[in-house]
C-alpha cells in the first residue's frame, strides 16, 4: 500500500514548513533557548499545526523525541479519564535524554468542559517537567484558564502561491505532469488547506501519471467556477429560467450537493465583488440572501428548492439596491 503523500511529504524540520514564516520564527527562538512554555496552535485544518508541533518536538528533544513525546487526538479521547490516566502516566515518567517531555493534544476544542478543567490541573501540576502543545480549530471553545496558561499562535490559511509551489514539487518528485489549471482549481476549492490540496493531487493522478482539470473535478465533485458564475450572472440579469436549468444540471447530472454549491456561490460572488463586477451595496444584499439559504439547508430543508428560491431573490437585488 502506497504511503499517503500528505505523510510522505510532511515537513520534518521547522525550516521546511510552508507559509507560516512568522510563527516558525517564534518557534525557532524556543529551540535556541532550549525551553518551551505551554503553547496553543489555533487555525483551520491543513494549515500546519500538527506539522509544526512535530517539527518543534524533534528540534527540542533530539534523537529521543519519540520517547519523550505523547500525541493524543481529543476527537478520539474526549473524556476526563483520558486526561487523568494517559497524560498523568506520561508526565510522571522522567524525560529520557531530553530536558523535558512534550504532550501534543490535537483538536482540544472537541474536549468537554470537564475534561478541559482536568487538563488545566495537569498542566499546573507538571509544569516543571512537561510542556503542552494544544491544537484547535476554534480557540473560543477553549476555557479561559487554559488559554491564559498558553502562548497562543494563530495560523492563517496558506497562500495559493505557496500551495501551488508545494504541489509542483510533489508532482516533480513523483514524476507526474500536472496541468497548471488543475493546480489552480485544487487551490480554489481547498481555500488554504495544504493537507486537502495534497490529498486531492494524489487522488487526481491518473494511470498515465498526469493530473488534469477534469480529473480534479471528478475527485472533488464540485461545480466548475465558470458554471457557477454563469448561473449567478443569469439570475442577476433576470434570466431566471436559464439560471434554474443550469442549477438543476449541476445538482442532478453532476451530483453536486447543495452545501457545496452555496459555498461556491459565496466564493464567486465575493470574487466578482473584488473584480468590481458586483457593487458593494448589492454584495451586502446577496450575502444576506445566501446566509439565509445556507441556514435553511443546514436545518434540513430541500437544497434544490432553497437554491432555486435563492436565484429568484437574486433577481430582486438590483431594484432593492
UniProtKB/Swiss-Prot annotation:
The keyword Lyase is annotated on this UniProt entry: no
Any single Pfam family the record assigns to this protein: AAA
Record keywords: ATP-binding, DNA replication, Nucleotide-binding
UniProt GO cellular component terms: DNA replication factor C complex
InterPro entries: AAA+_ATPase, ATPase_AAA_core, DNA_pol3_clamp-load_cplx_C, DNA_Rep/Repair_Clamp_Loader, P-loop_NTPase, Rep_factor-C_ssu_arc, Rep_factorC_C, RFC_lid
Protein task: Part of the RFC clamp loader complex which loads the PCNA sliding clamp onto DNA.
Name used for this protein in its record: Replication factor C small subunit
Organism, as annotated: Methanosphaera stadtmanae (strain ATCC 43021 / DSM 3091 / JCM 11832 / MCB-3)
Amino acid at each position: 500500500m502506497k504511503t499517503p503523500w500528505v505523510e510522505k511529504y510532511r515537513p520534518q524540520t521547522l525550516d521546511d514548513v510552508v507559509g507560516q514564516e512568522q510563527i516558525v520564527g517564534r518557534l525557532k527562538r524556543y529551540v535556541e533557548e532550549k525551553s518551551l512554555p505551554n503553547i496553543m496552535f489555533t487555525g483551520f485544518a491543513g494549515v500546519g499545526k500538527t506539522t509544526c508541533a512535530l517539527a518543534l518536538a524533534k528540534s527540542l528533544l533530539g534523537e529521543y523525541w519519540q520517547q519523550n513525546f505523547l500525541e493524543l487526538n481529543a476527537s478520539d479521547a474526549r473524556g476526563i479519564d483520558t486526561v487523568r490516566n494517559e497524560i498523568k502516566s506520561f508526565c510522571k515518567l522522567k524525560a529520557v535524554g531530553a530536558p523535558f517531555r512534550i504532550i501534543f493534544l490535537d483538536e482540544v476544542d472537541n474536549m468537554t468542559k470537564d475534561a478541559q478543567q482536568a487538563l488545566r490541573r495537569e498542566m499546573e501540576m507538571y509544569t516543571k517537567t512537561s510542556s503542552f502543545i494544544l491544537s484547535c480549530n476554534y480557540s473560543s471553545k477553549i476555557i479561559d484558564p487554559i488559554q491564559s496558561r498558553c502562548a497562543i499562535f494563530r495560523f492563517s490559511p496558506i497562500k495559493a502561491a505557496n500551495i501551488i509551489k508545494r504541489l509542483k514539487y510533489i508532482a516533480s518528485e513523483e514524476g507526474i505532469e500536472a496541468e497548471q489549471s488543475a493546480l489552480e482549481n485544487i487551490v480554489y476549492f481547498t481555500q488554504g488547506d495544504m493537507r486537502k490540496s495534497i490529498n486531492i493531487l494524489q487522488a487526481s493522478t491518473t494511470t498515465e501519471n498526469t493530473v488534469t482539470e477534469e480529473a480534479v473535478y471528478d475527485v472533488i465533485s464540485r461545480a466548475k467556477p465558470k458554471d457557477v458564475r454563469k448561473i449567478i450572472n443569469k439570475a442577476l440579469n433576470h434570466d431566471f429560467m436559464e439560471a434554474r436549468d443550469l442549477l438543476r444540471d449541476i445538482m442532478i447530472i453532476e451530483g453536486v450537493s447543495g452545501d457545496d454549491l452555496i459555498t461556491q456561490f459565496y466564493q464567486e460572488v465575493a470574487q466578482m465583488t473584488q473584480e468590481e463586477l458586483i457593487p458593494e451595496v448589492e454584495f451586502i444584499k446577496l450575502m444576506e440572501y445566501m446566509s439565509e439559504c445556507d441556514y435553511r439547508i443546514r436545518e434540513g430543508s430541500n437544497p434544490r428548492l432553497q437554491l432555486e428560491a435563492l436565484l429568484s431573490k437574486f433577481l430582486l437585488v438590483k431594484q432593492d439596491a
